[in-house]
Amino acid sequence: HNRSKLSPDKDNGATYHDTLKSLMSVSDVLSVCCPASNETINLINKETLEYLPKGAVVTNVARGDIVDDEALIDALERRKVYAVGLDVYKGEPNLNPGYLKYKQAFILPHLGSATKETRTAMANLAIDNIEEYFKTGNCKNKVN
């Protein structure tokens, strides 16, 4: 999904949906990849899950607060949603135990960033911060 409609020379045949309802109503797989913000907290909830076709699959690799766990568990129970794949979830590392009774709930311990490239970039950022701190007494990614 793109927030803005692309020009025909860039859309690669993609269909533009101007509402979440329009997009979700034709999505057999919903992959949540947006940032957490005031606008996206509980974006995937009881109402929006009803937009999906019966038997859809939902994945969340973004932030746990974007998905209402109780609504998603209810959708699993009713078989509105066939399966879920969660790399993130509300209250990490504590998982809503409601997911545990479903064989079609695949829960990962926040491994989405566990690629060699990402971990190398994280290590390099840490080194850069340490070097900057010892040179200037400050660092770019300071945590107080």
Please identify what each model-predicted range represents.
Residues 55-144:
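Rossmann-like dinucleotide-binding domain for NAD(H)/NADP(H)
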Residues 1-54:
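Rossmann-like dinucleotide/phosphate-binding beta-alpha-beta segment
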